[in-house]
Curated annotation (Swiss-Prot):
Could be a possible drug target as it is unique to certain bacterial groups. The gene is prp. Local conformational changes induced by substrate binding confer activity on the enzyme, organizing disordered segment Gly-21 to Gly-26 and allowing positioning of His-22. The keyword Iron-sulfur does not apply. Its EC number is 3.4.22.-. It comes from the Bacteria. Signal peptide: none annotated. Changing C34S: No peptidase activity, binds substrate. Keywords: Hydrolase, Protease, Ribosome biogenesis, Thiol protease. It comes from Staphylococcus aureus (strain NCTC 8325 / PS 47). One of its GO terms (biological process) is proteolysis. An essential cysteine protease that cleaves the N-terminal 9 amino acids from ribosomal protein bL27. Also acts as an N-terminal protease on the major capsid and scaffold assembly proteins of bacteriophage 80alpha. Cleavage of the N-terminus of bL27 (and thus this enzyme) is essential for growth; it cannot be replaced by a 'pre-cleaved' or non-cleavable form of bL27. Might serve a chaperone function during ribosome assembly. InterPro entries: Peptidase_Prp, Peptidase_Prp_sf. This is Ribosomal processing cysteine protease Prp.
Length: 106
């Protein structure tokens, strides 16, 4: 199962997103849950870097299964909007594939 741990500060701003695990919905290379979640995450990170002044701290495993993004500037409204959009997309995947992906808010 993919777990997505989301840390939100007292102001409701996303500070950390950690995605761990594997969806195990299909064969390696043919897992639509993994592909969807990965596309949402990587697309969002690329949008933050390409469209805003935010430069988040990023840590990931080259072999897959772990990605951590930490917001450096939680007052960057554009980056926060992209992060919130990412979470809505991941929630949509979770609603359909709740045995393969779980979002946890902290």
């Amino acid at each position: 199962m993919i777990t997505v741990d989301i840390t939100v500060n007292d102001e409701g701003k996303v500070t950390d997103v950690i995605m761990d695990g594997h969806a195990d919905h299909g064969e390696y290379g043919h897992d639509i849950v993994c592909a969807g979640a990965s596309a949402v995450l990587f697309g969002s990170v690329n949008a933050i870097i390409g469209l805003t002044s935010e430069r988040p701290d990023i840590n990931y495993d080259d072999n897959g299964g772990h990605f951590h993004i930490r917001s450096v500037d939680t007052n960057n409204d554009e980056a926060q909007l992209i992060l919130q959009t990412m979470l809505v997309s991941l929630q949509t995947i979770e609603e359909e594939y709740n045995e393969n992906i779980r979002l946890n808010y902290k």
